[in-house]
């Protein structure tokens, strides 16, 4: 995922762990190397900033920006990203783990003004959902 989102021009990624996450550690140095190689390959002038992994609760507690905010999850009735999209200079999108966000995590995100969205009718792996969400936002911005 790091390689692909770096190629398409994402500025920053923060890994979060949730109730259903399988991993609570990442190899930051390995991800940095992948990002740099991808940046060089794609002739990008900006380096992807990769943040340390933190809990969703910590992320939401410390989150205070004017970004357009979305949380992608599997609940029926969520609008597609392209229907919910509002142009802004920066975006934050939360992508859940393979087991999705818990209902409490979704509620906590809503309290921080994250809007629930869908990335489509198919169930996607986290890596695929991340790439699709980032690419979709970049395309909707242009």
Q: Which functions belong to the PLM regions below?
A:
Residues 103-142:
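Structured adenosyl-cofactor binding patch, chiefly the S-adenosyl-L-methionine
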Residues 65-71, 89-91:
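Short coil/turn segments at beta-strand junctions that form active-site/ligand-binding loops
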Residues 90-107:
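A C-terminal functional module that forms or caps the active site or interfaces directly
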Residues 76, 98-99, 121-124:
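Short, acidic/turn-prone active-site loops that include or flank metal/cofactor-
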Residues 50, 69-71, 114-118:
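Conserved beta-strand scaffold positions in the cores of enzyme catalytic domains, especially
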Residues 16, 72-73, 94-95:
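Short beta-strand segments
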Residues 1-68:
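RNA substrate-binding interface of SAM-dependent RNA methyltransferases
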Residues 73-87:
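Strongly charged, low-complexity linkers/loops
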